[in-house]
Regions:
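Extracytoplasmic Gram-positive cell-surface binding/anchoring modules and repeats
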Residues: 66-109, 187-203, 210-220
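C-terminal "post-core" interaction segments
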Residues: 233-258, 268, 431-432, 444-601
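N-terminal secretory signal peptides that target proteins for export/translocation
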Residues: 1-4
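Sec-dependent N-terminal signal peptides
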Residues: 6-18, 22
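Sec-dependent signal peptide cleavage junction
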Residues: 19-39
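Flexible, low-complexity junctional segments that flank or bridge functional domains
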Residues: 125, 133-436, 440-444, 449, ...
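N-terminal low-complexity, Pro/Thr/Ser-rich intrinsically disordered segments
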Residues: 32-65, 252-255
Length: 601
């Protein structure tokens, strides 16, 4: 039999395995490109074993290492489960750690069901007979304490207004429909035995941690680590951090490239379960489901491989070749592949066409800007009658506000400092400024809080709409900004209503929040877009891990939108300029640009 035919047969067999595995019967598969093996169990009978493992919460502290008891079913010693009471304790601790609120969960056990009820009354019911998770209100259960149902800006508590310089002045809400997540459809079992209830650790990470932006859980067969899912937590400047030594092993010794059949099969199924429930742009990518996607891909069976590098390569390909939405990125390779395998994948296969196109545009714009500003572009600059405000990232950076001196531009730090300084200067007595340009031509996004602060400074009020693609919930929140941080929200805090000509300079680099801002401006008659079309990016970013130990960012269920005539429009298509600029040098030759803007008045 020739090699090509063997691979074809292998792919067909793997497809059958995936179909069986993801339709309710647990199947363990191995696919190395030439063969697939599978075993199935028809009944839910379990022998439960346990092991206590060292546990780390976002840092390495040898004096504060905890122990967590994990459970393993029927001798499969690398697919860990967590008992429901332990899961709840971690969920409460992580929610309180991140948001400092009054988060609490009440646990009610009744036969094969466990109901978790928030202090707000929102609940989730886990059915251990049907392997389902039911939410009366998915958003209400997962959100931090906030004034509105979905608030990607003030997601903490009422006193957040004083901390962020933002105030919610109005909101409209439309609640979503009940949500049921069916793990059984993916061959994932929840286990009820005696008076104990167990769910897979990876399901806990994907379905309970990720939606609340609480990080991810990683298990390498030795330790349990809760982390943000960023490589810098484990490896910096060619050296392992202490947490990296725990996860990847001393000098990367856990990089064996070996994964068991059972773990590979479970991880593939759980990945599909997570993406089908958490990825926010599925229908826009014509992905009916990720389990169908694996069947449609010639290489989809490789997620079932017993070689971790083969699995990581397929995950990398799905992220960069299929999804390729710039927000969805492959962040970390498996402990079994080694910390630097991500670099091998990026160097050999690239980061995806969309990201590489953005990087090329970013490089070209930065290089052109450097010709005019070799020492760096100032955050605030006046050229004739035109003020320019420039920053390349939106950052929620309130720490330096106390150091801001309106008479000293060197004290400007980050988005809040730049906007506060600019509003103060532009609104000063006898100001010569007639035109204001917000230069986002090299802005690739950042914190939504800072983007909303900027919009409110320009318009007087920022209206941001959010849609949850999973639940269907729709919310529009309106914010005001306190740009001088005096605790008052008034006309001194904004450029609106001052008779100024307001502009936003955009390019194909303007992405994510750098795209959200001009999209909101586009619908306001008082701001004109100049430059070139912005680059899209509609969703906030979520993070998930896989059971084999890789981590990726994904476009979450939360789609940022604007509202027009009562309808919601996401911002993924970008904003077309009102006045186009074709030559790159004209973006940064501010003498030319000022004269051009004056000619438009």
């Amino acid at each position: 039999m020739n090699k090509s035919l063997k691979r074809t047969i292998s792919a067909v067999l793997a497809s059958a395995v995936m179909l069986t595995s993801m339709t309710g019967t647990q199947v363990f598969a191995s696919a190395d490109g030439t063969s697939v093996t599978a075993t199935a169990t028809a009944e839910k009978t379990y022998k439960v074993m346990s092991k206590s493992v060292p546990t780390y919460l976002f840092q390495y502290d040898k004096d504060a290492v905890m122990k967590t008891k994990l459970y393993f079913m029927n001798g499969v010693n690398d697919v860990p489960y967590i008992e429901i009471d332990d899961m709840v304790q971690y969920l409460k601790a992580l929610m309180q750690m991140k948001y400092h609120g009054t988060y609490d969960l009440k646990v009610e056990k009744d036969g094969d069901t466990v109901t978790l009820t928030r202090e707000t009354g929102y609940m989730a019911t886990i059915n251990f007979a049907d392997d389902t998770i039911f939410y009366w209100d998915f958003d209400g259960f997962n959100t931090a304490e906030s004034k509105t149902l979905i608030d990607v800006i003030l997601t903490v508590w009422d006193t957040a207004d004083g901390i962020t310089g933002l105030k919610t002045v109005k909101s409209t809400e439309r609640y979503g429909t009940p949500v049921t997540m069916n793990a059984a459809d993916y061959g994932i079992d929840f286990v009820h035995k005696g008076n104990k209830y167990y769910i897979p650790l990876q399901t806990f990470s994907d379905i309970f941690l990720s939606p609340g932006k609480l990080g991810v859980a990683l298990y390498n067969g030795r330790s349990l680590i809760f982390c943000r899912g960023e490589q810098a937590e484990f490896y910096v400047d060619g050296k392992y951090t202490q947490l990296g030594q725990v996860y990847y092993g001393k000098n990367g010794k856990y990089a064996t490239n070996k994964i068991s059949e059972e773990l590979a099969s479970f991880s593939a199924c759980e990945f599909c379960f997570a993406m089908d429930n958490l990825y926010g742009l599925r229908e826009k990518h014509s992905i009916d489901s990720f389990k169908t996607l694996l069947l449609q891909r010639e290489s989809g069976y490789k997620l079932f491989s017993t070689k971790s590098k083969t699995i990581d390569r397929e995950l990398h390909s799905i992220v960069t070749d299929v999804i390729d939405d710039r927000h969805t990125t492959y962040n970390m390779s498996s402990y079994a592949s080694g910390v630097d395998y991500i670099n091998t994948l990026d160097e050999k296969y690239g980061g995806g066409y969309a990201i590489e196109t953005l990087a090329d545009s970013f490089g070209a714009h930065r290089a052109e800007r450097a010709k005019f500003y070799p020492d760096g572009v100032p955050a605030y600059e006046e050229v004739g009658d035109t003020a320019y405000i420039t920053f390349d990232k939106f950052r929620m950076d309130m720490a330096y506000i106390d150091q801001l001196n309106y008479d000293d531009p060197s004290t400007i730090a980050g988005t809040f400092g730049a906007i506060s300084y600019a509003v103060n200067k532009i609104n000063r007595k006898d100001s010569p400024i007639k035109n204001v340009v917000l230069d986002l031509s090299c802005n690739t996004g950042g914190d939504a809080d800072a983007a909303v602060f900027t919009i409110a400074a320009f318009l007087g009020k920022a209206g941001i709409s959010v849609e949850n693609s999973k639940s269907g919930a729709l919310v529009t929140n309106y914010y005001k900004a306190d740009t001088n941080f005096d605790g008052k929200y008034n006309s001194k805090d904004t450029l609106a209503g001052k008779g100024l000509n307001l502009f936003c300079l955009t390019s194909p680099v303007s992405f994510s929040c750098g795209n959200l801002v001009p999209c909101v401006f586009k619908e306001d008659p008082n701001v004109s877009i100049i430059g070139q079309k912005s680059s899209g990016g509609a969703c906030t970013v979520g993070t998930i891990s896989t059971a084999t130990g890789a981590v990726m960012n994904i476009s979450s269920n939360f789609r940022l939108s604007y509202t027009k005539n009562g309808s919601f429009y996401d911002v993924d298509q970008g904003a077309e300029p009102d006045y186009a600029i074709s030559k790159l040098e004209h973006f940064y030759d501010r003498e030319w640009l000022t004269n051009y803007i004056d000619s438009l008045a």
